[in-house]
C-alpha cells in the first residue's frame, strides 16, 4: 500500500468515514485515523495467524528484537497493545515482554532513543541493552577451509579479516540473529518477535538467493517458524506492511524512531536489494507483496543440519555445491573440509585474509 500525504487544500473525503482525507494510498484516500487502523489491523491479523502455534494460544514471555528503526518500533507498539500490560486486554497474546537491543560499537544514541520511547510509552516493558564487549569476548577460530578450533578464548572477534564487505556484513547479520536466539533461551523467552516489514522480507528473499542461502528462505521470511533443534518461535508479523506505510504510521502516531538507520545502509547485498524494492514502490506498488506471498508458499524442508558458523538450516554437502558453481574448480585440497558449514558461509570463507575468530555464542553466558 504505497501512500503519499494529500495537499491541505484538497477537498477529498476519507473513503471509510467521510472525514477529510489526509493520506492517499494505492486504492483510496483515507484520514489519519482510518490509515492507522488499517495498518494495525494488518499487523494484528498476522499475530492472530500464529496464535494457534503457541502453547495455550499465547506466549508466556516474548523477546522483542529492537533495532530502533521504523519497523521494530512499530512492532513494539503493536506487541505492547496485544500484551497483558494493558489492563483492558481481555485476550492477551503475550504475558510478558522483553525488549532487547544489541549495541555494536560505542555509540549509545540509538539505545538512548529506544529507552526514552519505552519509558514514555511502554513503562511496564523491561528493556535491556547488550553491548559488543559483553558479547564478543570468547571466540572459536576458523580458516578458509572451514576447519574449526574451539580453544581460542583469548582472541577477539575480527571480522576485518574478511576482505569482502558484503561477506563481512553478512556475517555480522548472522551473528546478531544467532545471539538473539541464544539470549532468548537464557532469558526463558518462548518467542522472538522481529520487526521485518514486507519491504525487508522481499529484499531478504533476493539476498538469501544471491548468497547461496536459498534453502533457508522459509525460516527467514515466514510469519512463524522454528529453527531445527530450537523450541523458540520466530515471528514476523509486519510482513504485509511496506516500510513506507510504517513511516507514515509512526509519524501520524508521533512515535520515536531512529531515521538514521534507514539512511545509512551499507553498500552490501542487503542494502542494494532493500533500496531496489523501495525505489520500485511508486512504479510497481504490488511487487513487494508478490515476492512476500511467493516466499510464503515455500515449505520448511525437513532437516536437522545446522551451519556451525551462521546457525541457519543448511543443505548438506556444501563442498559439492561449491564445486558445481565455481568456474575455475579449486583443487579438492583447497575445498571446504567441514561438512557442517553451509554453502553461503563456505563462499564467504574464501575471502579470508587470515584466521577468523567467531563469537562462541554458547560460551558467552549472556
Swiss-Prot record:
It comes from the Eukaryota. GO terms for cellular component: cytosol; cytosolic tRNA wobble base thiouridylase complex; nucleus. SUPFAM superfamilies: Adenine nucleotide alpha hydrolases-like (SSF52402). Gene3D superfamilies: HUPs. Keywords: Cytoplasm, Nucleus, tRNA processing. Pathway: tRNA modification; 5-methoxycarbonylmethyl-2-thiouridine-tRNA biosynthesis. GO terms for biological process: protein urmylation; tRNA wobble position uridine thiolation. GO terms for molecular function: nucleotidyltransferase activity; sulfurtransferase activity; tRNA binding. Plays a central role in 2-thiolation of mcm(5)S(2)U at tRNA wobble positions of tRNA(Lys), tRNA(Glu) and tRNA(Gln). May act by forming a heterodimer with ctu1 that ligates sulfur from thiocarboxylated urm1 onto the uridine of tRNAs at wobble position. Prior mcm(5) tRNA modification by the elongator complex is required for 2-thiolation. May also be involved in protein urmylation. HAMAP family: CTU2 (MF_03054). Belongs to the CTU2/NCS2 family. This is Cytoplasmic tRNA 2-thiolation protein 2. It comes from Schizosaccharomyces pombe (strain 972 / ATCC 24843). The lineage of its organism: Eukaryota, Fungi, Dikarya, Ascomycota, Taphrinomycotina. The gene is ctu2.
Amino acid at each position: 500500500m504505497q501512500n503519499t500525504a494529500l495537499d491541505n487544500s484538497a477537498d477529498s473525503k476519507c473513503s471509510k468515514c467521510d472525514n477529510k482525507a489526509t493520506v492517499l494510498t494505492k486504492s483510496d484516500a483515507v484520514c489519519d485515523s482510518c490509515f492507522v487502523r488499517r495498518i494495525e489491523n494488518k499487523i494484528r491479523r498476522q499475530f492472530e495467524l500464529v496464535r494457534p502455534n503457541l502453547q495455550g494460544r499465547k506466549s508466556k514471555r516474548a523477546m522483542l528484537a529492537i533495532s530502533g528503526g521504523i519497523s521494530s518500533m512499530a512492532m513494539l507498539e503493536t506487541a505492547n497493545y496485544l500484551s497483558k500490560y494493558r489492563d483492558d486486554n481481555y485476550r492477551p497474546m503475550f504475558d510478558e515482554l522483553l525488549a532487547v537491543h544489541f549495541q555494536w560499537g560505542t555509540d549509545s544514541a540509538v539505545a538512548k532513543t529506544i529507552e526514552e520511547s519505552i519509558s514514555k510509552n511502554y513503562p511496564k516493558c523491561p528493556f535491556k541493552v547488550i553491548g559488543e564487549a559483553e558479547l564478543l569476548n570468547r571466540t572459536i577460530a576458523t580458516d578458509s577451509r572451514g576447519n574449526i578450533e574451539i580453544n581460542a578464548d583469548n582472541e577477539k572477534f575480527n571480522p576485518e579479516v574478511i576482505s569482502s564487505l558484503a561477506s563481512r556484513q553478512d556475517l555480522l547479520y548472522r551473528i546478531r540473529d544467532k545471539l538473539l536466539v541464544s539470549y532468548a533461551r537464557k532469558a526463558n523467552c518462548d518467542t522472538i518477535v522481529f520487526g521485518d516489514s514486507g519491504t525487508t522480507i522481499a529484499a531478504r528473499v533476493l539476498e538469501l538467493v544471491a548468497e547461496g542461502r536459498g534453502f533457508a528462505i522459509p525460516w527467514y521470511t515466514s510469519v512463524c517458524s522454528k529453527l531445527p533443534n530450537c523450541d523458540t518461535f520466530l515471528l514476523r508479523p509486519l510482513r504485509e506492511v511496506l516500510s513506507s506505510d510504517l513511516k507514515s504510521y509512526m509519524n501520524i502516531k508521533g512515535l520515536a524512531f531512529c531515521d538514521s538507520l534507514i539512511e545509512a545502509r551499507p553498500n552490501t547485498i542487503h542494502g542494494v536489494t532493500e533500496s531496489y524494492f523501495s525505489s520500485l514502490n511508486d512504479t510497481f506498488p504490488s511487487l513487494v507483496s508478490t515476492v512476500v506471498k511467493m516466499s510464503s508458499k515455500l515449505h520448511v524442508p525437513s532437516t536437522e543440519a545446522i551451519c556451525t558458523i551462521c546457525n541457519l538450516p543448511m543443505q548438506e554437502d556444501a563442498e559439492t555445491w561449491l564445486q558445481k558453481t565455481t568456474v575455475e574448480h579449486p583443487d579438492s585440497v583447497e575445498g571446504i573440509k567441514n561438512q557442517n558449514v553451509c554453502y553461503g558461509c563456505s563462499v564467504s570463507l574464501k575471502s579470508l585474509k587470515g584466521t577468523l575468530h567467531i563469537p562462541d555464542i554458547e560460551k558467552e553466558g549472556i
